Amino acid sequence: QGPVYLRFGRLALPVFHDEATFKFEIGKGEQLTEGSDVAIIATGLEVNEALIAAEQLKNEGIQARVINLCTIKPLDEELVVKAAKECGAVVTCEEHSILGGLGEAVAAVLGEQCPVPMRRVGVKDVFGHSGPAWELLEQFGLRSDAIIAAVKELV
């Protein structure tokens, strides 16, 4: 049916959904938390960082909706637009270049269907490096503190 791209990280992460009831569906995202101040849309291991950020933001009075987008193409446009309309601001998070990834896909959809303030957390336009995963997340600004900073720029 065509090319497929799967990406697996090196880190052990928590399970975010009920394995007994969750059914993976290409092109469908999953809302993990309720929130109305900002939508944090994440993919891959950044979902864990987004959940950590949302918990800390909650302690500061900011209600963040965390969405896990397992697939970027096709993108769950309905879920993305709904979150943008209901929250009024969006932060995307990806362990990937901000060029050509989740952030650009979400920005394209929102630009046409629901323009809202938005920030992208991801690897800037630089060459990558090899090394221990947690060190690289810190080096490239992909930890929860970077997500929190991006949220605070918007709300």
Each language-model region and where it sits:
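Basic phosphate/pyrophosphate-binding loop/patch that engages nucleotide-derived ligands
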Residues: 1
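Thiamine diphosphate
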Residues: 4, 9-155
